[in-house]
UniProtKB/Swiss-Prot annotation:
Role noted for this protein: Produces ATP from ADP in the presence of a proton gradient across the membrane. The archaeal alpha chain is a catalytic subunit. Component of the A-type ATP synthase that produces ATP from ADP in the presence of a proton gradient across the membrane. The A chain is the catalytic subunit.
One Gene Ontology term from the biological process aspect of the record: proton motive force-driven plasma membrane ATP synthesis
Alphabetized SUPFAM superfamilies for the sequence: C-terminal domain of alpha and beta subunits of F1 ATP synthase, N-terminal domain of alpha and beta subunits of F1 ATP synthase, P-loop containing nucleoside triphosphate hydrolases
This protein's name: A-type ATP synthase subunit A
Membrane topology value: Peripheral membrane protein
UniProt-listed InterPro entries: ATP-synt_VA_C, ATP-synth_a_Xtn, ATP_synth_asu-like_sf, ATPase_F1/V1/A1_a/bsu_N, ATPase_F1/V1/A1_a/bsu_N_sf, ATPase_F1/V1/A1_a/bsu_nucl-bd, ATPase_F1/V1_b/a_C, P-loop_NTPase
GO MF terms, alphabetically ordered: ATP binding; proton-transporting ATP synthase activity, rotational mechanism; proton-transporting ATPase activity, rotational mechanism
UniProt EC number: 7.1.2.2
CDD domains recorded: ATP-synt_V_A-type_alpha_C (cd18111), ATP-synt_V_A-type_alpha_N (cd18119), V_A-ATPase_A (cd01134)
Residue ranges of the TM segments: none
Main location: membrane
Compartment(s) of residence: Cell membrane
Origin species: Pyrobaculum aerophilum (strain ATCC 51768 / DSM 7523 / JCM 9630 / CIP 104966 / NBRC 100827 / IM2)
Amino acid sequence: MSGKIEYISGPVVKAELPGARLYELVFVGEIKLFGEVVRIQGEKAFIQVYEDTTGLKPGEPVERTGEPLSAWLGPTIIGKIYDGVQRPLRNIEEISKNPFIARGIGYDKAPPLDLKAEFDFKPAVKPGEEVYPGDVLGSVKETEPMTHYILYPPLPEHAPGVVEWIADGKYKVDDVIARVKTKRGVVEVKMWHKWPVRRPRPFKEKLPPVEPLITGVRTVDTMFPIAKGGTAAVPGPFGSGKTVMIRTLSMFAQSRFIIPVLCGERGNEAADALQGLLKLKDPSTGRPLLERTTIIVNTSNMPVAAREASVYMGTTLGEYFRDQGYDVLVLADSTSRWAEAMREVALRIGEMPSEEGYPAYLPTRLAEFYERAGRVVLYGSKERVGSLTIAASVSPPGGDFTEPVTSNTLRFIGAFWPLSPRLAYSRHYPAIDWLVAFSRYVDTVEVWWSKNVSPEWRRIRDALQSILVKEAELQEIVRILGTEALSEYEKHILNVAFMIREGFLKQDAYNPVDTPSAPIKQFLLMKAIYTYYEEGLKAIESGVPASVLRELETVKRLPRLRMEVTNDVAKEELTKFIESLVAEIRATTNRRG
């Protein structure tokens, strides 16, 4: 079960390792560095090492483990901060006595779960009941907002059976909490189990994503929505607001569990994001957001190979909580760094490069990642539903959206929120370019908006989007001929588009009144602007100039409403405002008439 190192090239080690399997976890060298077999040629194995290989030399041993890189899943996972291979960073800091991660710290020294922690276990089944893989056996209260459900793991070796023994009481995470008698023998179930990170967890059926994931960001929720179980990408160059966007989603998205994966970002930026996440309060409960969050951090100065593992690790943790019946959101920042790590390892093991040096299987890996999202009927005997939503930022060099990572990502996602440097530099945040962005979920979430907010939602949303497109066309004329060449109708279009941009699309992420924006507030803000557009058209037909309409007191207030009206009084306040807006425009029309 062991071999010897033959040569070392950065994070890649070639070793003579008879019997090795693809993606098997191995320990490299005398200090036992984490590694994973990524290519096999005869008796030779190419290993990507998840730790710094400095000081390794040919001839040192390589030990096989016989199992793939796996996530440890069970209580004490919530609130943890892990590295890319699920080692808890706080524990590593205590062991290392150093802000940098010491090498050779394995799961024996820093286990991902606190196996000695005790919890009050409450059974959900009784002795004699039949259970299937994926069924809930019981639960423990891990944090105030999160109940941790203990599953009969859907592992290949587990078969349906009858509960032989289960009892409530105080148990350690590593204790046996149930025994299930199957045709293959008696299975002892503990509170935790392992799952290979590259293998998607099973489910019965994939359902269409029909319920929107409300994020509190108006541009996202109304114009380019994402559904629970959907996928989204946030590409943008440096300084365009990707990290703030990810922070806003992590704080306000209406998911029960959130997993931010900071993959290959700058250390200082990751530290700032971490400090911010640790201080954040859950707006719905007022308790620390960390009580329903697990964070994975893999900064750019950490070993490059661990970036790839971090994305798979985050997705596996997300699937685990999805299997408990929760709506889960995985936020990856950024997949470009993940792809760069893939490129470096592929080139070092001698694989044929494709476009811009990326491996030919880049589209396949991106598809495997995004396709793990979904709203699904869960494995087990009872009808349960859970969802895993994936939103990932992309960092294209120079903001070039035609580069391979961005262009291939476009093939597999349902919502595209590109960040424009032009908008960011003009201090328009979130800097989502409404002329390039798209969402494939508008049709599927329309039923939810019609039922829960207003049947007019789709009609008004489409009208506002058309006005923004028309504005872009008119701006070309204005640049050449000026506004004097425009008709009153066209001037009105420009005025309305300004209101949409300033009073609806723009949003201050740090203003508690402006962010988050409740669905009813979003709709009524949109309706107020659309009312200005509709009533304004009638006034212009009656001879009222667009410039007069723009100077009305209620119209002047339109861009400020988002900052003045809170979510709890939005329905009453904005309904009154729309009535006063209609009254003032009609009064002006009557006077001019």
